[in-house]
Amino acid sequence: MKTIIKIITVSIICTGCSEDFLVQPPLNAPTSGNYWHNEEEAIMAVNSLYQTFRMDNAYNCGHILLGDMIADDMTIGGAASSFLPLDDFSFNPGSAHINGSNDSYGLWGVWFNTVYRANWVLENIDKVEKISEEIKTRSINEAHFFRAVAYFNLVIYFGDVPLFTHLIGPDEATSAERTPANLVWQQVEKDLLKAAGLDNNLNPSGTPLPPKGKYELGRVTEGAAYAFLARVFLYQEKYDKAEIMAKKVIDLGRYDLNPDFGANWDNMMENGIESIFEIQY
């Protein structure tokens, strides 16, 4: 009898309890609501931008192969390769390397992922109270650099694309219209000029990204911003400005051609004197 009473009592207690205590916010991972407290968190947020460059259809391999295949600088063998639609120009918005697959972002997604992360940094960095002005400025410039590179790649592949310079939600993401390519190019230039500490006339106007060697290996530098600006101007046939930016890279005195051309493909010679910006693996 005592056993029956105990069972009934326990059953009443269990069925009468609220389950609210079982519903807990994530306790072992950061969220948008509990982030941006200190310098370390700001740096980690910026570091996530570097990670996007290592994704499959970014600079890891897909982005490089896409351009070379479409330009006929290389071809693909076999009949089952996911790159085949690019080789014979039968690709469409649903193709794996454009739209993505179950295990990776496509060309479209990987660069908009970069844009989102850059905007996340730029919209939240001012919330951080415990951060030095030097690291804050560096972080802002890094975010502008990565957003510029992302939109550069989007505009050269797709032309008119949605232009986001702020964080967006699902509704805006699904209803966004394409922005004319010329306005996207303007934003790319604007972001890179900010990262390089230059005004529209290419004169110093602010604090640029740090020089090569000041921080840990692999971070973007003023030289990278100058060099990418030169590339952006070249694509737009703004040759005078491209020449100015290329000369700025040379005048830094930190880069030179490698005496041994083959060393550029030697794993033991990575981040050499000819390297302006390398993705670290």
Where are these regions (language model features)?
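Sec-dependent signal peptide recognition
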Residues: K2-V10
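Hydrophobic h-region of N-terminal signal peptides that target proteins for export
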Residues: V10-G16
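Membrane-proximal, proline-rich intrinsically disordered regions
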Residues: C17-I70, N264-W265
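Short linear capping/connector segments at secondary-structure termini
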Residues: L27-T31, A96, T165-E172, P208-K214
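Short, surface-exposed recognition loops and adjoining beta-strand edges that mediate ligand/DNA contacts
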Residues: G33, N60-A80, F164, N201-F228, ...
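Conserved, well-structured interaction surfaces
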Residues: N38-I43, N47, Q51-A58, A80-F158, ...
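Extended, well-ordered alpha-helical segments in internal regulatory regions
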Residues: A150-D160, L229-K238
